[in-house]
C-alpha cells in the first residue's frame, strides 16, 4: 500500500490523508449523521432506488499533461532543471489546452528563482502552437507552454515538489491567466469558506454545465502543502478530478471529501 501511495499524485495523496483524518475522527468521536447523509442512506436502504442522474457533465479536458520526463524539456533547456514542473503550471496548461488559447501572450516577466537564478520570459513574442500540442504526450509546444506558465507564477522549482500560488495578486495563476495569457477579466475565484457546501457545489456545477472546467486549490493537514488540479466534470455530487499526473488516478471524488479552499 505504501508503494501505491508513493506513486499517486501529490494532490491526491493530500486528499487520501484527509480521508484518513476524517475516518479516524469519526471512529474516535462517533457522531449522528448530517441530515443530508441520513436522507441518502434512507433512500438507498428503501429498496426503491432508481437508476439515472438528474445532472451530469462528462469530463471536458482530454489533456493528461505530466510533471516529469520529457514534459519538462522546456524548463530543462532554459534553466537546467528537470524535476516536477509544478501542479499549478499543469492545471493552467491543461485549461489553456482545453480552450486552445492564447496564440500569443501579453507582456513579459522575470524573477530570481531560489536555486536557478534569474529567469525571464517574453509572452508577447511567444507562439503557443495548440494545433501541435498533443493531449497525451509531450511536444515542443506543450514543453514551451509549461515553462512559460511556471515562470508566469514565479514557480519555486524543487525536486521534492515545485510550488506557486493559485490565487491572489502577482505572482499567481489567477493574475497570470488574465494579465499574461489574455483570459477575460471576469474570471474569478471563489473561497469555499464563503459559501455553504450546497452553494459551492452548485457554483462548480454551473461552471461545468457551461463547459467551463476550473482550477481548484486545496490544502492538506499543513497550510504549506497546497495543491492545484482541474475539475472538469461531475456525476451527481461526485466531481471528476484531473490531477495533472499523466492521467494517473483521474476519476470521480465525492464533493464533501474534496478539501477545497478556492476555485
Model-inferred region functions:
Residues 80-97, 138-147, 155-177, 225:
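Active-site nucleophilic cysteine motif
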Residues 175, 179-239:
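Active-site-adjacent substructure of cysteine-protease-like catalytic cores
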